[in-house]
Amino acid sequence: GYGDRNFLRF
């Protein structure tokens, strides 16, 4: 999900 990608982004 978007939240997962957001976490991986940082």
Swiss-Prot record:
The keyword Secreted applies. GO terms for cellular component: extracellular region. The modification Phenylalanine amide is found at residue 10. Belongs to the FARP (FMRFamide related peptide) family. This is FMRFamide-like neuropeptide FLP7. Its main location: secreted. It is found in: Secreted. GO terms for biological process: neuropeptide signaling pathway. Disulfide bonds: none annotated. Keywords: Amidation, Neuropeptide, Secreted. It comes from Macrobrachium rosenbergii (Giant fresh water prawn). Transmembrane segments: none annotated.
